[in-house]
Amino acid sequence: MFWRLGCAATVLLWSASAAPADSINIDGVTRTFTVKLPKARPAPLVVVLHGNTQTGEDMISRTSWPQLARRENIGLVFPDGLNRAWADLRSNSKRALRTPPAGTDDVGFIARLVEKFVGDGSADPKRIYVTGVSNGGAMTMTMVCERADLFAAAASVIINLTDEFAAACHPSRPVPILMMNGTADPLVPYRGGRGSSRFAADGFWSTEKTLDFWRHVNGCDGQDSASVDLADSDHDDTTTVTRIESRCPRGGDVVLYRINDGGHRMPGSFSDARFPRAVDFMLGPQNHDIDGAEVIWGFFRRFP
């Protein structure tokens, strides 16, 4: 569930330069984050959550969110997980690699950030969104489960639910949600179970079962309403994209972007790796037909 797998992958992926982070105190614990706000306020605000072993700065340097935000005049906040991990609805024994300290309240941390920027007039309370990759995708789903009242829409990337996670998830209301998963992911297998990587955790649901869960939560029909193969604009990346839509009540949209033959990486208009072939070997290919941030923002901007 992680873009950086130990020291070797840290060298192979683009390394994030250190950036000054803001901080906030949560129950006596100093939590850090990086925020980028436009001059025109209140603005839409997207909470962007990093993967395991990462920090918010990785999402700034490895995705197109900053460029998109400047163009669209939206705010971004990049929180940092303690020990570079998030306390999602799974127990620590069900995770791989890093785990957050016992008792970490990441739901409270992220909610406090949203309340802070809404409270000071920086963010429009009707246009708050949350997205994340891998462990950050699991934390995104956790925020929908625990604080659906805060968000107009959500998007999870390269993550599936587990039995434990789903049993603890009881959203207070439907939240439009977009999923983006690769069929050749070695860490979070598309068909569920345990991934082929030695770093993988076990017990994942399949992407189809995870999709059905959110369809049920949002009151959607159980069958696909449309399946569209998107243009294969980059023939060299060995992957393609299929958009799968659902028939849902208004305001409860559920959409899956299936990255055919895609790995444990967010699609992007530029590479997330310094040595792409080596990272392709460890994590699978990165799709370049779509840009993950652009697709997610295109979904978000429809809500409310």
Task: Name each model-derived stretch.
Residues 1-7:
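Bacterial N-terminal signal peptides that target proteins for export
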Residues 277-304:
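Catalytic active-site module of serine/aspartate enzymes centered on a nucleophile-bearing elbow/loop
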Residues 44-46, 175-176, 254:
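Alpha/beta-hydrolase fold active-site loops
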Residues 61-64, 118-120, 125-175, 186:
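Primarily recognizes the serine-hydrolase "nucleophile elbow" in alpha/beta-hydrolase
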Residues 152-235, 245-250, 261:
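The feature captures the conserved acid-bearing segment of alpha/beta-hydrolase catalytic domains
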Residues 10-19:
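Hydrophobic h-region of N-terminal signal peptides that target proteins for export
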Residues 22-129, 139-142, 146, 191, ...:
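Serine-hydrolase catalytic machinery in alpha/beta-hydrolase-like enzymes
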Residues 51-55, 81-86, 134-138, 160-163, ...:
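Solvent-exposed loop/turn segments at secondary-structure junctions
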